[in-house]
């Protein structure tokens, strides 16, 4: 009389896996007293060679059932255990990005400056408190802002950053006025502007103007506009000089 060892598939088990995994061995779910070397199958009686699966092929929220059956020597009955796997989504925070805005510009969505295909719903942290994922140069400090998505275990959290810099718009100065005689010498309109106007702008007005010079003998009085542009992404800013002749 020969006594055979009855097969032991262990207890049913369930776990969650992250879909960032490309390889997972189901044998790790077996109890310590369960011998490996049996066969693994999933729904449809599909054989799983070696018990190794690829969680990344499944959509988030998918539930997949596997059966483990150790070899059963005659006349012992077969035994099996059911392993239920739930697939969870690995958060995608995208890739690092940069945002250059104008110091006087409107608020911008930092999410739009992340690379890749980031998931929505994360949280922002940085040098200033962030509301609604917006960067507002009027009230916030430039620097590195991090975007974080929390992962449900066993998935891990994911983070990326947006580095914000601010460009300072050029200053055209402040409006000025001047009254001249028709026989006065020519003068530079920039000298009439108040403040500290940036150099390199352009002048436009009732008469064509070259180099910012106004010549009472050949030019018409009126409002002359001084415009400076940039740097990118800042737009243009203007100031005026109103010329009167007596």
Sequence positions of predicted segments:
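Proline- and Ser/Thr-rich low-complexity, intrinsically disordered segments
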Residues: 1-246
């Amino acid at each position: 009389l020969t006594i055979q060892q009855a097969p032991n598939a262990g207890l049913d088990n369930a776990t969650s896996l992250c879909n960032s995994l490309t390889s997972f061995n189901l044998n790790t779910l077996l109890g310590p007293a369960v011998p490996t070397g049996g066969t693994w199958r999933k729904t449809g009686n599909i054989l799983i060679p070696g018990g190794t699966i690829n969680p990344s092929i499944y959509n988030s929220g998918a539930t997949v059932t596997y059966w483990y059956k150790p070899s059963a020597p005659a006349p012992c009955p077969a035994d099996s255990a059911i392993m239920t796997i739930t697939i969870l989504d690995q958060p995608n925070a995208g890739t690092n990005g940069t945002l250059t805005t104008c110091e006087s510009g409107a608020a911008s969505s930092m999410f739009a400056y992340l690379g890749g295909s980031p998931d929505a719903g994360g949280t922002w942290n940085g040098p200033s408190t962030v509301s609604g994922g917006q960067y507002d140069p009027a009230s916030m400090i430039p620097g590195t802002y991090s975007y974080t998505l929390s992962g449900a275990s066993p998935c891990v959290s994911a983070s990326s950053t947006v580095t914000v810099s601010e460009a300072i718009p050029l200053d055209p100065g402040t409006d000025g006025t001047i009254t001249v005689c028709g026989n006065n010498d020519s003068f530079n309109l920039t000298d009439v502007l108040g403040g500290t106007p940036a150099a390199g702008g352009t002048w436009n007005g009732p008469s064509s103007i070259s180099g910012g010079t106004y010549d009472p003998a050949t030019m018409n009085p009126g409002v002359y506009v001084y415009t400076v542009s940039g740097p990118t992404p800042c737009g243009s800013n203007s100031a005026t000089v109103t010329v009167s002749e007596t």
